[in-house]
Regions:
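RNase H catalytic domain
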Residues: 70-77, 118-189, 193, 202
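Catalytic phosphate/metal-binding cores of nucleic-acid and nucleotide-processing enzymes, i.e., regions
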Residues: 109-110, 114, 197
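Charged phosphate-binding loop/patch that engages nucleotide di/tri-phosphates or the phosphate backbone
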Residues: 195-208
Length: 208
């Protein structure tokens, strides 16, 4: 883990939290973030966002890009999903929704992750895209499709069956796992959309 301090008593990249904390403690207006890679930390210090650059490169290669996330609330007995789509021209499309299907509710937030991917791929096909790159933070989504993981639960079985019969022949989908809660702006946006749908019962498609 790397801690990048942009404004503080000392600036730069620190390899542990105590050192980073000493650099910002008591400093008014301190700016800092935590990253999984040194490359991301270095980019932050010079105001670069590697994920924005990565998405731009994907778009240039002709991919529709989608970041998906899911959420779940046990007390509400409800799951939700959020999708942040970036089109090749740089415009964005936001999708979110919720559900409480009793067949899938025992999968917690994983069913939300599943419906996020389903909605992203469905949107791509409906709008004439042939390639989509899906960034997600639950590795089962891709491993169920490749057979690396067995789809044992009803939710995962539904996902594999639907994908194979409805989507696979119509769009080329590439799955990329990203670390959850790691300052990836589009992933954080998908997370916010999912939480908004969960708490406010929003089910919308919004072009941004």
């Amino acid at each position: 883990m790397y801690y990048a301090v942009k404004k503080g008593h000392a600036t730069g990249i620190f390899n542990n939290w105590p050192e980073a904390q000493a650099a910002i403690s008591g400093y008014s207006g301190a700016e800092y973030k935590k990253f999984n890679t040194k490359e991301e930390a270095e980019a932050y210090l010079i105001n670069r966002d590697l994920w924005v650059e990565k998405v731009a490169a994907d778009n240039k290669d002709g991919y529709l890009v989608a970041f998906t996330d899911g959420s779940y609330d046990k007390e509400l007995n409800r799951y939700s999903y959020g999708v942040a789509i970036i089109l090749p021209d740089g415009t964005e499309q936001d999708i979110c929704g919720y559900g409480s299907n009793k067949e899938y509710i025992d999968s917690d937030n994983i069913i939300g992750e599943i419906f996020g991917v389903i909605n992203a791929v469905d949107w791509a096909i409906s709008n004439g895209y042939e390639k989509i790159k899906i960034y997600h933070d639950y590795e089962g989504l891709s491993k169920w499709l490749t057979g690396e993981w067995n789809a044992k639960a009803k939710a995962s079985q539904m996902f594999v069956s639907l994908y194979k019969t409805k989507f696979e022949d119509f769009v080329k989908a590439e799955f990329v796992k990203v670390p959850g809660h790691s300052n990836v702006i589009y992933n954080e946006k998908a997370d916010r959309l999912a939480k908004s749908a969960l708490m406010d019962r929003k089910k919308v498609t919004v072009q941004g």
